[in-house]
């Protein structure tokens, strides 16, 4: 016997809600929710779990060896994943079109097969011949026989292929191109993506097959599809990079098997993609002599310390209001630092055109780069080059104070490893690596006084670091 009940369904994304709403809660469209009558069995049915069910057992009796991570063979990717891919896990890799997602995953399949494990690469966007052409270009088309290709867009056919091939790794490129006849909506829609992901996830966990899904992103950078897509999977990775450059980064957003804030660096080239063990060299402008308007900092991207360079240029305005051009740094934060220099250090920089940029396309998003931005602006204002062995780390407050940042010991260790011998930092009890002198400034005025001191000692080490109280102001003249 069945009971009739009412539901409310969006005509655009097919999202179902229990009550009527003027605006769809899923896609945000207005006036698309209509009432529909559905039949349900008396008592209803229970929703099947995505993960295989098991009885209650003591945690000490659970065998965890079968779920140990399997290395992919790509060290930078394994770093983000927490050592490798866990059998039965589902990983979502999202990124902009053309950033290199397919190239990276084809390289993963190649390394996976080289270790004697079978991989199935399913594409709903390319034919098997097109995938083979790309595999030949990056050098992984003929070396191994354990890579299987399938050009399919029906999820049930993909599940049959998994049963037939019996792979240890399945790559689906992409989840938005897969469809199922058991769900309404168009391919790539919210309902279809949710149903396809649930079916693939259930199959992966039931067969202990590692599954990697490729996801599209919207113009705002968010993962396309329902929010539940990120809840269904075990790992969410974002693949980022400037299409005009070769640097690529994989950021962990969610990871049930490791840290969720790791970052892997890659270099995309004509013959594939390679991991970068020491990416700091990409973010530094190698020059033999110091140049005014530059400052070095160490930022933490997740848990990874990266050395970056800030460049500043001040120019006389050509009529009208002064310009502010910022690249790689938050414009609002750059304006705040300029205001602090104007107010507390009495540097008349607001009347100038201000240009700020980072080297190598690096994005400085954390406050630890504030001090480097301030020093770069002051150095450009006074035309005072700083030694290339100095690094600046610290947050600048509106009161002109220099504040501590987390992970200072890790940052200083990375700076020392890169050959820096002078560190301008806020007061703290963090240990300083051997061979490095720490100049501790509590205010922006004291930091600028230290800047003048180390500029006078260019090319030499400071045997005895100077001490400043941080009161008053630094009479920096405008350089020519």
UniProtKB/Swiss-Prot annotation:
EC number(s) stated in the UniProt entry for this protein: 3.6.4.-
GO cellular component: cytosol
Short sequence motif RadA KNRFG motif: positions: 254-258
Record flagged with keyword DNA repair: yes
Residue span of region Disordered: 459-480
Residues where ATP binds: 95-102
Keywords associated with the record: ATP-binding, DNA damage, DNA repair, DNA-binding, Hydrolase, Metal-binding, Nucleotide-binding, Stress response, Zinc, Zinc-finger
Matches recorded under PROSITE patterns: RECA_2
Designated name of the protein: DNA repair protein RadA
Note: Was identified as a high-confidence drug target.
GO molecular function: ATP binding; ATP hydrolysis activity; ATP-dependent DNA damage sensor activity; damaged DNA binding; zinc ion binding
């Amino acid at each position: 016997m069945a009971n009739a009940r009412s539901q409310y369904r969006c005509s655009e994304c097919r999202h179902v809600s229990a009550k009527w709403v003027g605006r769809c809660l899923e896609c945000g469209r207005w006036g698309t929710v209509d009432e529909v009558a559905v039949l349900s069995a008396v008592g209803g049915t229970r929703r099947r779990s995505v993960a295989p069910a098991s009885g209650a057992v003591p945690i000490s009796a659970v065998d965890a060896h079968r779920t140990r991570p399997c290395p992919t063979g790509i060290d930078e990717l394994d770093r983000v994943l927490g050592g490798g891919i866990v059998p039965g896990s589902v990983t979502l890799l999202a990124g902009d079109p053309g950033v290199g997602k397919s190239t990276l995953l084809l390289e993963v399949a190649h390394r996976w097969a080289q270790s004697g494990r079978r991989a199935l690469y399913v594409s709903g966007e390319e034919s098997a011949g097109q995938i083979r052409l790309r595999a030949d270009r990056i050098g992984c088309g003929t070396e191994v026989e354990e890579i299987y290709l399938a050009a399919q867009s029906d999820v049930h056919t993909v599940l049959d292929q998994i049963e037939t091939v019996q792979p240890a790794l399945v790559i689906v490129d992409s989840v938005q191109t897969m469809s199922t006849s058991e769900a309404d909506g168009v391919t790539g829609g919210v309902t279809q993506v949710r149903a396809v992901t649930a079916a693939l996830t259930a199959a992966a966990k039931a067969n202990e097959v590692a599954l990697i899904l490729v996801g599209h992103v919207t113009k705002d950078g968010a993962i396309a599809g329902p929010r539940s897509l990120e809840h269904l999977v075990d790992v969410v990775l974002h693949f980022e990079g400037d299409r005009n450059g070769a640097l690529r980064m994989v950021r962990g957003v969610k990871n049930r098997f490791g840290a969720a804030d790791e970052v892997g660096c890659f270099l995309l080239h004509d013959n594939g993609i390679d991991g970068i063990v020491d990416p700091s060299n990409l973010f530094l402008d190698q020059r033999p002599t110091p140049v005014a308007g530059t400052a070095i900092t160490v930022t933490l991207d997740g848990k990874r310390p990266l050395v970056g360079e800030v460049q500043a240029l001040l120019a006389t305005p050509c009529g009208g209001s002064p310009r502010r051009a910022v690249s790689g740094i938050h414009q609002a934060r750059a304006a705040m630092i300029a205001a602090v220099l104007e107010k507390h250090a009495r540097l008349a920089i607001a009347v100038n055109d201000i240009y700020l940029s980072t080297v190598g396309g690096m994005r400085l998003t954390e406050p630890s780069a504030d001090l480097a931005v301030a020093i770069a602006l002051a150095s450009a204002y006074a035309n005072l080059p700083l030694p290339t062995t100095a690094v600046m780390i610290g947050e600048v407050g509106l009161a002109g104070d220099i504040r501590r940042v987390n992970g200072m010991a890790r940052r200083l260790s990375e700076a020392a490893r890169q050959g820096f011998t002078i560190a301008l930092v806020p007061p703290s009890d963090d240990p300083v690596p051997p061979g490095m002198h720490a100049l501790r400034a509590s205010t922006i005025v004291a930091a600028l006084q230290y800047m003048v001191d180390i500029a006078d000692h260019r090319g030499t080490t400071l045997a005895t670091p100077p001490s400043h109280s941080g009161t008053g102001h630094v009479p920096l003249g405008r350089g020519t």
